[in-house]
A protein has these predicted regions:
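Solvent-exposed, non-transmembrane regions of membrane-associated and secreted proteins
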Residues: 12-185
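N-terminal Lys/Arg-rich, disordered targeting/topogenic segments
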Residues: 1-15
Length: 185
């Protein structure tokens, strides 16, 4: 009798372990299958979170004084792992404005500097001393080549830009209008 109970307990433990392992493998499989979709959802959510409409003029002024990384060589490629890692670090990013190209349906936050996380969710300034509305205003971001609607995320819409389109930048004080005069492919 006691031998049957012992076997029954061992079987229950074994079944529980198998069920936990199977559940883990199913979750891992789903994460791998929906890898780019998960990345895209996080990117869209954070891009919306940092839109210029979500930030006050005072926050923008304060963020303009923040230090930023302007080393273009330190920028890493966009990957799902990097986006997930950045999501878990939950930092407050220095929004200093917004960029919009209505014909391309592009609307992104502008962050100070070229930190990788900045470029995952919007555009980053390339030079520390540039001033919005004065001459050229250099920005960088990523282009995405895979996933649903990849051509509509970050700087990917710029592949469809044409001469004569207008780019609008704002720091919530003024709106600056730039015209695209040359597109190099």
């Amino acid at each position: 009798m006691s031998q049957k109970r012992t076997k029954s307990k061992k079987n229950k433990r074994k079944n529980l372990l198998i069920n936990i392992l199977a559940g883990f493998l199913i979750l891992l499989s789903l994460a791998l299958i929906f890898n780019s979709k998960i990345r895209d959802v996080i990117m869209i959510w954070n891009t919306n979170k940092y839109q210029v409409s979500q930030v006050s003029k005072e926050e923008i002024e304060e963020n303009k004084t923040a230090t930023g990384n302007f080393d273009f060589d330190s920028v890493k490629s966009l990957s799902s792992e990097a986006v997930l890692s950045a999501q878990w670090s939950s930092q407050q990013l220095p929004v200093i404005g917004g960029i919009s190209i209505p014909e391309l349906e592009m609307n992104l936050p502008i962050f100070k500097g070229l930190d990788n996380v900045n470029l995952f969710y919007g555009a980053g300034t390339m030079k520390a001393d540039q001033v919005m509305g004065q001459g050229n205003y250099s920005l960088a971001s990523h282009r995405i080549f895979t996933g649903k609607d990849a051509d509509q995320k970050l700087f990917s819409p710029l592949a469809r830009a044409t001469n004569g389109m207008f780019i609008y930048l704002t720091d919530k004080e003024k709106v600056y209008k730039y015209e695209i005069v040359e597109v190099k492919k």
